[in-house]
């Protein structure tokens, strides 16, 4: 038993010496202006932060400049979770745009788009907007989040 404990301690020491990058990895703040943005929906800028094993986006940032409107899109997509990072997002559901039916979401707001959901639109009517989009193709919401969904 004592011999086994010595071997485990030696193995742990060797592993910490052999993998110093893993043992001391620091977190990194991304510089958003250094990311590669592409134009989407003709008016917004998207930067992909993470991809799945097939190269499909898992996490992305979406910038919408003040005064820009993203037309209805997104029907039938996977489960998506959007977090407003900055600005006030004007949001509407459906194929027909109705500004009177728009809702406003400020920084820290979270919007859930269910898998297979309908179209929606977005606008930056008051200021620039930055969103983080997380795509959950194989995942699902936690029970407390799922309980808040309305159909």
Label every model-predicted segment.
Residues 70-72, 91-92, 113, 119-125:
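Short beta-strand His + acidic residue motifs that chelate non-heme Fe in jelly-roll/DSBH
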Residues 21-60, 102-104, 146-151:
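A short, N-terminal "cap"/entry segment at the start of jelly-roll beta-barrel domains
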Residues 65-67, 75-96:
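Glycine- and acidic-residue-biased ligand/ion/polar-headgroup-sensing regions
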Residues 9-20:
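Bacterial N-terminal signal peptides
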Residues 1-10:
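Bacterial N-terminal signal peptides that target proteins for export
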Residues 53-54, 95-117:
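Short acidic-glycine-tyrosine-enriched beta hairpin
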Residues 106, 115-140:
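Ligand-binding loop in jelly-roll beta-barrel domains
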Residues 58-77, 114-116:
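Conserved short histidine dyad/triad with adjacent acidic residue
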């Amino acid at each position: 038993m004592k011999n086994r404990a010595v071997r485990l301690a030696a193995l742990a020491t060797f592993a910490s010496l052999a993998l110093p990058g893993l043992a001391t990895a620091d977190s990194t703040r991304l510089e958003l202006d250094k990311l590669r943005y592409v134009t989407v929906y003709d008016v917004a800028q998207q930067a992909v932060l993470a991809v799945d094993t097939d190269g499909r986006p898992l996490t992305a940032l979406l910038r919408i400049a003040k005064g820009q409107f993203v037309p209805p899109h997104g029907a039938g997509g996977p489960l998506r979770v959007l977090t407003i990072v900055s600005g006030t997002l004007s949001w509407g559901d459906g194929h027909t745009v109705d500004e009177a039916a728009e809702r406003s979401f400020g920084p820290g707001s979270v919007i859930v788009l269910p898998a297979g959901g309908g179209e929606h639109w977005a606008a930056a009517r008051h200021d620039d907007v930055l969103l983080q989009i997380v795509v959950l193709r194989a995942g699902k919401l936690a029970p407390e989040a799922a309980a808040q969904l309305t159909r």
